[in-house]
Regions:
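N-terminal subdomain of nucleotide-sugar transferases
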Residues: 1-43, 85-87, 105, 109-115, ...
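Short aromatic-enriched loop/helix-cap "lid" or pocket-rim segments at secondary-structure transitions
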Residues: 17-18, 45-50, 105, 128-133, ...
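A conserved catalytic-core segment of Leloir-type glycosyltransferases
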Residues: 29-91, 151-152
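Short, hinge-like loop/turn segments at secondary-structure boundaries
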Residues: 51-56, 110-111, 134-138, 205
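Short N-terminal targeting/anchoring amphipathic segment
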Residues: 82-101, 115-119, 124
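Membrane-proximal helix-turn-helix segments that form the acceptor-binding/catalytic region
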Residues: 111, 124, 136-186
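Carbohydrate-associated surface elements
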Residues: 193, 214
Length: 221
C-alpha cells in the first residue's frame, strides 16, 4: 500500500514529528511505500523517500496577510494536488496540518476520493489555542461546540488578539466545512480523553479510535 504522510514540520521538533518519522519506518517494515508532505525548512530530515514540500510559513515573523493562509492556502491546495498526482497514494495519514498547511490540503485529498486518517496529537480541533487553558492559565472548555469568540475575548493564543482571532476564524472554517466530522474519514487520538472531548464536540464515536503512541521496546532493553 502507498501511504502519504503529512505533517507541517519535517524535523524533530516535538512528539508528533517523532511519531511521524517512526510511523514511516514501521510502515516500511511491513512492506508499505511511504512519501512525505510537509513544509520547507533548513532543518528538514532527508529520508530517502519521496518528499513534497510547500513554502515555510512562520506564524511569529510572517506578515499579517500571509497569516491568513492558515485558514485556506490556495498554494498548498495546488501543491497537494501535484503530490497526489505524482505519488498516487492509497491512503493519506495526516498529522499536524492546521495553520501552516491549512485545510485546503484536505479538500485536495477529498477531491481525489482518497481516504484520510488523521492523528489528533492535540486538542486544536476543539480549542483554537490548543491548550484548553485560557490566558489566565485556567482550564477552559468555553470554545467547544464552535464558540470560538471566547478565544478572542480572552486573548488565549499567546496573549495576542490577532493570533486569537485568526485561530477563531480557522476554527469556524473547519466547523462550517465539517473538516473533522465529514471530510476526514477516521481519527486516531493518543488518549481516551481526546476521544471523549471530540465526541462531546460533535464527532461521531464510530470514526474515532484511541490508540496510544507506540514505543520501540528494544530501545529500552
Amino acid at each position: 500500500m502507498k501511504v502519504l504522510l503529512v505533517n507541517k514540520f519535517h524535523y524533530l521538533k516535538g512528539g508528533s514529528e517523532k511519531y511521524y518519522f517512526e510511523l514511516a519506518e514501521l510502515l516500511k517494515e511491513h512492506g508499505h511505500e511511504v512519501a512525505f508532505f510537509s513544509m520547507e525548512d533548513q532543518k528538514n530530515i532527508i529520508t530517502g523517500d519521496k518528499e513534497y514540500f510547500v513554502e515555510k510559513i512562520d506564524l511569529n515573523t510572517g506578515s499579517k496577510l500571509k497569516a491568513l493562509d492558515v485558514i485556506y492556502s490556495k498554494t498548498n491546495y495546488k501543491k497537494m494536488k501535484e503530490a497526489l498526482e505524482d505519488f498516487k497514494p492509497d491512503i493519506v495519514h495526516v498529522n499536524n496540518f492546521q495553520r501552516q498547511l491549512s485545510a485546503s490540503i484536505i479538500k485536495a485529498i477529498k477531491e481525489k476520493n482518497i481516504p484520510i486518517v488523521f492523528t489528533a496529537h492535540d486538542v486544536q480541533a476543539i480549542c483554537p489555542a490548543i491548550t484548553m487553558m485560557d490566558n489566565d492559565k485556567k482550564i477552559c472548555e468555553k470554545c467547544m461546540h464552535g464558540k470560538y469568540l471566547n478565544c478572542v475575548k480572552k486573548k488565549c493564543n499567546k496573549g495576542s488578539t490577532l493570533k486569537s482571532l485568526i485561530g477563531a476564524l480557522e476554527g469556524y472554517y473547519y466547523r462550517i466545512n465539517k473538516i473533522y466530522t465529514k471530510k476526514i474519514d477516521f481519527i486516531i487520538t493518543p488518549s481516551e480523553f481526546y476521544k471523549v472531548k471530540l465526541i462531546e464536540d460533535g464527532v461521531s464515536g464510530e470514526k474515532i479510535e484511541a490508540l496510544h503512541n507506540f514505543v520501540e521496546l528494544s530501545k529500552y532493553d
